[in-house]
């Protein structure tokens, strides 16, 4: 009984929300200042004289977002030379060779970087000893199982050099990937060596570096293409052989594993005579243990990608999509007070939202929309007659450089100005 009462309460609450929310088109064109995408979608597109109406809707929206009642009256514009000089000095824009100003859209670039960072995972894997001497084994974490695009991959090795080394200043360190069989063709410019190991394995040179042998320090070896091949083959294990022919001559040595770990694997349970005070050295060597640093992300077409890209209207689809619409400030006579950019991408959303599209992952606007659609599809009152709408699901900011009524140059960053993607509410 309490469950039925709770269900009835939720339905009543949702009914109140729906009744109190304005329906599309109930306010005529008054929605233009706050939602240009909604206003443009309601205007007729197939009427020859509809273009001016769409431009007027865009004008009202821009003025509203800049908190202006009307366009500034620029009676005596600042001389072009003075304007360009001020822009260069203040670093608010970039002046091209043709004299046009390109505004530096910092917020847009920052938003793109933040989105990319959110989609990128960083995994650090410490080395274990390999099956043979001077070999390392890396087992990439299961966290990376869904990652298929390598942004960066590096192996970090510590070169330990004695203080008395004076014989050689440089040594060459090479990294070879060990495989049972070389699969697929090698990328252009890569070098490969096939060396028989028990008649089964082969080796491929994946990184090489000439390093300074006069001081103890970390050295970084890029292995992005190697890890990319590994992920493409659906593998997570990497076996590496380290070669440094000149290291013995200089007395330098690569710390491939800490002493404690090496002793365990070689079965040396007892300490040798004279090693009683070596605990500090062992701990220090453990801190120099090799590791693999991997930065990777999911591919664009991954089935479990966090967010699907919205559709672009191309005339071939009639479901919810983004329609491109560009307004040039020069064409509408606004380039006298708007310095940059040269126009506005007034994209809008249009198309149908059938029941199998509305409320699905990637097209749903919110959890509330999904719940409403769940009841609507099952014919539950009061949602049976409600229809899904094609609305913006992702917007991006826009920077503008313009004159105000006092001939002052203003730079303003406006949030949620350009429609990037559309979906069904």
Curated annotation (Swiss-Prot):
The keyword Nucleotide-binding does not apply. Residues 260-289 are annotated as: Disordered. It is found in: Secreted. This is Inhibin beta A chain. Disulfide bonds join 313-321, 320-390, 349-422, 353-424. It comes from Ovis aries. GO terms for molecular function: cytokine activity; growth factor activity; hormone activity. Its main location: secreted. The lineage of its organism: Eukaryota, Metazoa, Chordata, Craniata, Vertebrata.
């Amino acid at each position: 009984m309490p469950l039925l009462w709770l269900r009835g309460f939720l339905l009543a609450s949702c009914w109140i929300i729906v009744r109190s929310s304005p329906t599309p088109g109930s306010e005529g064109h008054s929605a233009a200042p706050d939602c240009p995408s909604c206003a443009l979608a309601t205007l007729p597109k197939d009427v020859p004289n509809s273009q001016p109406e769409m431009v007027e809707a865009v004008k009202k929206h821009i003025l509203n977002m800049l908190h202006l009642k009307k366009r500034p009256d620029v009676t005596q514009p600042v001389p072009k030379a003075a304007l360009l000089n001020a822009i260069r000095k203040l670093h608010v824009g970039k002046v091209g060779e043709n004299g046009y100003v390109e505004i530096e859209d910092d917020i847009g670039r920052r938003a793109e970087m933040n989105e990319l960072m959110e989609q990128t995972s960083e995994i650090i894997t410490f080395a274990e000893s390999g099956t043979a001497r001077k070999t390392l084994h890396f087992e990439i974490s299961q966290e990376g199982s869904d990652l298929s695009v390598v942004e960066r991959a590096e192996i970090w090795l510590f070169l330990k050099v004695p203080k008395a080394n004076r014989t050689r200043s440089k040594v060459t360190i090479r990294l070879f990937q060990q495989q049972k069989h070389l699969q697929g063709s090698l990328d252009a410019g890569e070098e490969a060596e096939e060396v028989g190991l028990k008649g089964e394995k082969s080796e491929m040179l994946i990184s090489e570096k000439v390093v300074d042998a006069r001081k103890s320090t970390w050295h970084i070896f890029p292995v992005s293409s190697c890890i990319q091949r590994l992920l493409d083959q659906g593998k997570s294990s990497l076996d590496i052989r380290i070669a440094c022919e000149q290291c013995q001559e200089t007395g330098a040595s690569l710390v491939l594993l800490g002493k404690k770990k090496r002793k365990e694997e070689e079965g040396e349970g007892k300490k040798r005579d004279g090693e009683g005070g070596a605990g500090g050295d062992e701990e220090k060597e453990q801190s120099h243990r090799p590791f693999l640093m991997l930065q990777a992300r999911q591919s664009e077409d991954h089935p479990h990608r966090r967010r699907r890209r919205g559709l672009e209207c191309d005339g071939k689809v009639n479901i919810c999509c983004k329609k491109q619409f560009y307004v040039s400030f020069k064409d509408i006579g606004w380039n006298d007070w708007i310095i940059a950019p040269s126009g506005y991408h007034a994209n809008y959303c249009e198309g149908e939202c059938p029941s199998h599209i509305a409320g699905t992952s990637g097209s749903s606007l919110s959890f509330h929309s999904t719940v409403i659609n769940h009841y609507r599809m099952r014919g539950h009152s009061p949602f049976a007659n409600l229809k899904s709408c094609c609305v913006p699901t992702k917007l991006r900011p826009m920077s503008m450089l313009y004159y105000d009524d006092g001939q002052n140059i203003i730079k303003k960053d406006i949030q949620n100005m350009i429609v990037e993607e559309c979906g069904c509410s």
